[in-house]
């Protein structure tokens, strides 16, 4: 099947077949990343603008690398260097950028739904690199790819997601993707960080304790506390949080012995993950980062409608 979307804004907007296509393409893209010369002419002549209104290390860098490895011209713009600091609106910024004829705009923005707003008004493709607490589709895809690498499948696996569910766009993309692919998703976190009606996000089980969520889990995805989105303190302190919802060698034993431990980054060591676990044999955090480049190459490729050229 072909990929028929101009934009990639949320995994919930995609079908199971489309998610499988993106993951399959990412698997093929990894061969390029293993070469001595990591470049193919697939997107030669295309222009990609990475427009980031929020800070980012992994996502922005990997989107830039992904574009360059496909031979696209990439331009990076951050909020601090844009006219947003002078009061320019998002739409005016986007319209001015579109006047320069880019093919794809990859954007991260603090406002949920901002990508839908632009997609209706711009002719170029829009890829969501994270919008508020709404979604982070590339993170969801790379999480699924990383798990598929290990188990060869996603259906039937027990996936525990632990932490600040309310403010996490990663949680929403993971829930959408994993439930669509047949995984069993279990959620745990402080009641103040569990959104009302979370069951509406997908076929999930909300657990009263962390132990219930990670008991016999195949995969544990730990989320950081999104303090920049909370506006107020939702936990007494990080030490108390870590006591009940931090992953350490002792409570990791509740999961399966070979359970995968994952984290979207940045990690707050000693809060959601102990250093022993973050650096241990169960950790797949760096594999997630590695797969992020291939996944973002696949996303750029499919929204461009190009034909893969590998020579």
Swiss-Prot record:
Annotated L-aspartate binding sites: 86, 169, 224
Class of enzymatic activity (EC top level): transferase
GO CC annotation terms, alphabetical: cytosol
Catalytic function, reaction form: carbamoyl phosphate + L-aspartate = N-carbamoyl-L-aspartate + phosphate + H(+)
InterPro entries associated with the record: Asp/Orn_carbamoyltranf_P-bd, Asp/Orn_carbamoylTrfase, Asp/Orn_carbamoylTrfase_sf, Asp_carbamoyltransf, Asp_carbamoyltransf_Asp/Orn-bd
GO molecular function: amino acid binding; aspartate carbamoyltransferase activity
EC number: 2.1.3.2
One record GO biological process: amino acid metabolic process
Pathway stated in the Swiss-Prot or TrEMBL entry: Pyrimidine metabolism; UMP biosynthesis via de novo pathway; (S)-dihydroorotate from bicarbonate: step 2/3
Residue numbers binding carbamoyl phosphate: 58-59, 108, 136, 139, 265-266
Keyword set, alphabetical order: Pyrimidine biosynthesis, Transferase
Its job: Catalyzes the condensation of carbamoyl phosphate and aspartate to form carbamoyl aspartate and inorganic phosphate, the committed step in the de novo pyrimidine nucleotide biosynthesis pathway.
Family: Belongs to the aspartate/ornithine carbamoyltransferase superfamily. ATCase family.
PANTHER family in the record: ASPARTATE CARBAMOYLTRANSFERASE, ORNITHINE CARBAMOYLTRANSFERASE, MITOCHONDRIAL
HAMAP family recorded: Asp_carb_tr (MF_00001)
Complexes and interactors: Heterododecamer (2C3:3R2) of six catalytic PyrB chains organized as two trimers (C3), and six regulatory PyrI chains organized as three dimers (R2).
Protein name: Aspartate carbamoyltransferase catalytic subunit
Species: Geobacter metallireducens (strain ATCC 53774 / DSM 7210 / GS-15)
């Amino acid at each position: 099947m072909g990929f028929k979307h101009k934009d990639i804004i949320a995994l919930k907007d995609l079908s199971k077949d489309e998610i499988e296509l993106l993951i399959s393409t990412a698997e093929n893209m990894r061969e390029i990343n293993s070469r001595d010369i990591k470049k193919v002419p697939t997107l030669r002549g295309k222009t990609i603008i990475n427009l980031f209104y929020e800070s980012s290390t992994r996502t922005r860098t990997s989107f830039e690398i992904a574009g360059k490895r496909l031979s696209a011209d990439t331009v990076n713009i951050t909020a601090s260097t844009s006219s947003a600091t002078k009061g320019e609106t998002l739409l005016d910024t986007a319209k001015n950028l579109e006047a320069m004829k880019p093919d794809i705009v990859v954007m991260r923005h603090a406002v949920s739904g901002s990508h839908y707003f632009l997609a209706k008004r711009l002719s170029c493709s829009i890829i969501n690199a994270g919008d508020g607490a709404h979604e982070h589709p590339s993170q969801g895809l790379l999480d699924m790819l990383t798990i598929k690498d290990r188990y060869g499948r996603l259906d039937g696996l027990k996936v525990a997601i632990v932490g600040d569910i309310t403010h996490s766009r990663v949680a929403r993309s993971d829930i959408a993707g994993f439930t669509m692919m047949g995984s069993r998703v279990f959620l745990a976190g402080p009641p103040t960080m569990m959104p009302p009606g979370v069951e509406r996000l997908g076929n999930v089980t909300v657990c009263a304790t962390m132990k219930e969520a990670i008991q016999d889990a195949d995969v544990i995805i730990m989320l950081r506390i999104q303090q920049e989105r909370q506006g107020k303190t939702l936990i007494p302190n990080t030490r108390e949080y870590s006591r009940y919802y931090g992953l350490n060698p002792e409570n990791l034993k509740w999961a399966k012995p070979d359970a995968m431990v994952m984290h979207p980054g940045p990690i707050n060591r000693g809060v959601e993950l102990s250093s022993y676990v973050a650096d241990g044999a169960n950790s797949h955090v760096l594999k997630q980062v590695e797969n992020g480049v291939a996944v973002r190459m696949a996303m750029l490729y499919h929204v461009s409608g190009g034909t893969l050229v590998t020579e």
